[in-house]
Amino acid sequence: MLSNWIHRGASALLLLALAAAPATALAQLDIPAWSTLLLEAVSDGYVDYSRWADNPRFDALTEQVAQTDTGAMNREQKLVFYINAYNILAARGILDGGSPEGLIGRHVYFKRDKYDVAGERISLHELEHERIRPLKEPRIHFAIVCASASCPILRSEAYTLERLEQQLDSAAGDFINDSDRNSFDVEQRKAALSSIFKWFEEDFVEAAGSLQAYLAQFVEDEKAVDLLERHAFEVDYLRYDWSLNGKR
């Protein structure tokens, strides 16, 4: 009888452990600590990377990115982890002397340099294209930040599970309505868009049927929305500025 009670108790504990696994896995990355570091170093998207240099708190985050187990995570938990991981490691690359400027610099920064992510040794390019994009969330293109001036701004807060939808919507709206990155001339019916919309057009088309339909969900100007919904804009793409989004 005692052995049966012990067996049932052990089974119950195992079930509780399995149920808690996703939350535990996500908790391996100290998101509040990342938010604190962002608040200390980021102002209106401008990053003072020197605040994270030789910083044991930042180094601890890169270790956590390496050790986190994503096996039990659901889609939303993976989005939170991978978005934060990308932004942490993009900064790590800058601190290690990397740069997205120049063709060679971009190749080294995005493809050659490797990082430990959830038990794998991968590049920023692989992290984006093989781990994040397969989650089918086009708003990630406004959340992951490649340390360049034309990238979306790095926000002064980490992405969290509780606020993920709100944060992604905010990131998309802020980026699309930023006149330095996208402009909509309703009189001439011409749109000058970030090259992000050219490079990843298939992601936006898959989500909304067309690029202009996707943009219409976030654009604030009502006249521009009307034209976008009628696919009436002639679209061109802006030159991408790969200069650093802050200082080392």
Where are these regions (language model features)?
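Interaction/scaffold regions that mediate signaling and macromolecular assembly across diverse proteins
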Residues: L26-A72, E76-R248
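Bacterial N-terminal signal peptides that target proteins for export
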Residues: L2-A12
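N-terminal signal peptide c-region/cleavage motif recognized by signal peptidases
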Residues: A20-P22
